[in-house]
Amino acid sequence: MCFTYILELNLGNKALNVAIRMAPNQKYPFNTRSFFTEDGKRPLRGGVELWRGYFQSIRPSMGKMIVNLDISTGLMYKPGPLINLCLDFFGKPDPNFLSPKRGLPDRERLRLQRFISGLRIITSHGPSGRAQTRVIRKLSSAGASGQKFTMRENGEISVADYFRVHARKTLKFPDLLCVEVG
């Protein structure tokens, strides 16, 4: 009897915690128990920022339930174009730094890949042309002009040529790394 009562209280407490987190989690970035706002954000080097966050939970106390609210801090990627984030990571201003043809060492490409792997990005370059959220998997070892893939009907084509022919878009930096997304 007592064990069942404790389980029911625990389940009720979990439900209340989910309920108080629902609205902030729909409006702000969050992790398991905290949500974060841009208020008071602090830029750091390397393409990241510190954001103020709030941890909240409902706790049982003697004869009542209390809301616990604590301050937390989260590390966020700098918002904006992906190319800017990559340049900030290296502290470089010239986009051509990200070109394997122009000497980007493979170890630096792998460092950048570890930094952005798993990052969710919004792109409108898909077949539909609508904005889609994608997850970065890895970086190509060649630039868009050297990275090739096979199309069913047309054979092998470079990423840069694909965009030029099929999307009618000439890439501004065809020698930069490609991002492989899932």
Where are these regions (language model features)?
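Argonaute/PIWI-family RNA-guided endonuclease scaffold
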Residues: 1-182
